[in-house]
Structures are given as C-alpha cells and as structure tokens.
Amino acid sequence: MKPSRTEVEQAFRGLRDRIVARLTELDGGGRFVRKDWERPGGGGGEMSELRGVLFEKGGCNFSSVHGERYPTVPEGKASEADLRLGIRAPAPEEVAGQPFFATGVSLVMHPRSPFVPVVHLNVRYIEVGQAAWFGGGTDLTPFAPFEEDTAHFHGALREVCGDERYARFSQWAKDYFFITHRNSERGVGGIFFDYLRASEEIFQFVQNVGDAFLRAYVPLVERRQLTTYTENDRQNQLRWRGRYVEFNLIYDRGTLFGLKSGGNIEAIFMSLPPLVSW
C-alpha cells in the first residue's frame, strides 16, 4: 500500500525543517531565508536559501507540484536484481499524457572553505496516472578529498541502505554523477536511486535516507571548517566548481524536470555556486 500525498509532504517538510535548523546552527552566523513560490500550472514550493559564514551559499527547497501532462519519459528496463529491490520504471505508455504529482526536498551546500566538501541531497515522490515511485540520493563533492571523510560518508549510507541496496545505489551514483564530456566523476560518490515503487516500506527507507544525511555530512564539516587555506586553494576551488555547474545544467534530472515542468527558476538554479571560474 502506498502512502498518501499528505503523508509524504508532511514527512518531507519535517526533513527540510530539521536539516535547516542543524545547518543554521553549524554555520554560526547566517540564517536560511524562506520564500514561497507558486507554479502557474499547479502547486508550488518553499525556497530556503543561506548566505552565511561557513556556507558561502546553500539552499534547501521543498516543492509540491502537479500538472495535466507528465513532462518526461522513464528510461530503461529493470534487471531481476533491480526488481528484487523494488526498482521498476513504468512503461512509457503508462505515463504518456497522464496527469502527475511530484513532491520533494532538494539541498545543495557550497562551503566557503575549499576543504569543506560540497554536498547534495534529494528525496522525491512522483505519481503519474496509476504509477507511483520514490527517488533520491546524496553525494559528496570535495575539492580536496580526504580518505577518512569519504569512508565516513559512505559508511553512514551503507548503514542506512544495507549491503544489497548500498551496492546497487552507490554504483548507480557513480554512473549518474559522471561528467561525460570531462570523462570524470563529479565527486567521490554517494548513493542514487530512482523508480522505487511506492509502498510503506520504501517510504520509510526514503525517510531513513533523509535522516542519515546529517550524520553523514556534519562530522566532515566540523572536522575541516578551521583548516587554513591559501588564495591558490581558493582559485582552484572556483575552477573545480565549474564542473559542478556543468553537470547540473547538462545532466541533472531534477534541473531538467524542473525546467520542463514549469518550475521556479530561482529554486531550480539554487544548486549553482555563487562564484565560479573556468
């Protein structure tokens, strides 16, 4: 049995509120400014943006939108192993021309220090016609990777996923967060999943992923935030950010879905850093 739209919206808003509260505390000087927006075709959302001391720019957005025609087509077929994990993209004929509902939380944090990693989190729920599924993921993009930080981040995700899901979803992240024209990964990975058919068990799993985010990320910030850096480090960080921008504008599913579905432009481009160079 799938959860109700109201249950999912409430859970996602609660997740947004917990993350915003903890990251505000961590920043120590800035605060998230919330701004409501409405989508002309139906629904809307709430932007929460931080311009802080520790975090040069960050955003944690909630959205809940609906419309008459689903703007994208699911990709690929699931293997038997994927089916065991609950992964099954609906067939194109199931969703073509169908009304849709989508709600989710999307976060990206761009720290000021080159030694504190960029982080991304997304959880989402989509209904199209009679089909309903969850998707999401989280990944780490350090300019200067530390093995112990990568191990901690992935360890927290393995704990919440279990071995089988972690193996599939971490590989999915490696494949998804890949910048083809650069022939390189965006960062040090994480997890990515999509088309998890909606059920109470999957709903709980997605909530658990959201709750694991702070455990995975906050210790890394606390460990690196006082590390000194040079102007050369800063300039290299800005050039590295260019790859983040390239991925988000060319490949990111959330960006493309938002643009195709008439989403809020400010919220869609919230993921972009405030300063970047090539």
Which residues are covered by each model-predicted region?
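A generic structural motif
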Residues: 4, 113, 129, 140-146, ...
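Flexible loop/turn segments at secondary-structure boundaries
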Residues: 70, 115-116, 228, 253-257
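Compact, glycine/acidic-enriched structural inserts
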Residues: 129-172
